Amino acid sequence: MRVTVLTGGATAERAVAFASASQIVAALRSRDHDVHVVDTCTGLLDDAEEANVLSGNVGTTPPSVAELDEQERKMLSESLAELAVVRGSDVLFLALHGGAGEGGTLQAILDVIGVPYTGSGQLASALAMDKDLSKRLFRAAGVPVPAWFMSPVAPEDVKTGLGWPVIVKPSKQGSSVGLTLVRKPQDLDAAVQLARRYDDEVMVEQFIPGRELTVGVLGDVPLPVGEIVPKHELFDYESKYTPGMSEETFPAKIATRLARQLQEYALTAHRALKLGGYSRVDFRVSPDDDIFCLEANSLPGFTRTSLYPQAALAAGIEFPELCERICTLARNKRPARGDN
């Protein structure tokens, strides 16, 4: 196959995207596919540029707002539609996280170009990126979610409606960027201001003590449940992308009944958002085994430490085969019209 990997982008998760792309490119080339790499900020990468950007580490903190502004100034001026390598591809593999690349904008452009691409369509991508809208759809589909408010919200309303502590996070952001665990009313405003650096809409969410679990979906089949035990109190940016900062177990050592319920909820959430190809759905499970769905990821990470490839491996799917399967799913799906 002729595969073009789209990566980078002007988002807080740019480094994560490159780390995912590095693994995907190596896996597909190991199967003798013709692979090119395009940074959606700067365009087609030559061999030297590719080696440079795909060899870096994610780091322990996301980029600053100033760095994001600089990336936006470097945004690709030539339309993706005019890149011959894009139009000549059998499939586009989206190694993108956050921003236009994951939130539906790029998907809408690719629908016009007419080249198959991995993951979900424009509408599903936009819904998954918006935590407020996606949680409303989960709840309507019968998937339990933590209670939440959208900022602004008064501390007394937080105490009454959610209780302390709470999670404050940007509504449309991933990798725990801009996320804070707030224990006291006097710390709420600072947490909201931090989250607002990354998105105009901020969610204040009930904190669920307990276990962190995740379920991948491939095609229309749930993968084995995984459990994450981070070294920090939360599964934050550093815990997600620094080797040794969290312990992941696939399959999770949980009761069969609980695992099946999590898989059922993951598939329901996947369908509620009309996600396609693959996704990962994250949960918290209370000490009483009450399940709460946090979010669905339409383009889960494919880095060395990412959860989705570990889930696939637990199902007997090696990483190169996983990448090929995702490409095949993309090539076999009907032309997108913003509804898949």
Region locations from a protein language model:
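ATP-dependent carboxylate activation and anion-phosphoryl transfer catalytic cores
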Residues: 1, 8-10, 137-139, 257-340
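Active-site nucleotide/adenylate-binding loops and adjacent lid/helix of ATP-dependent enzymes
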Residues: 3-7, 19, 83-87, 125-211
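Hydrophobic beta-strand scaffold residues
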Residues: 35, 116-117, 145, 166, ...
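ATP-binding N-terminal substructure of ATP-dependent carboxylate-amine bond-forming enzymes
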Residues: 1-123, 127-129, 133, 140, ...
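Short, flexible, mixed-charge acidic loops at enzyme active sites
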Residues: 50-54, 108-111, 234-242, 298
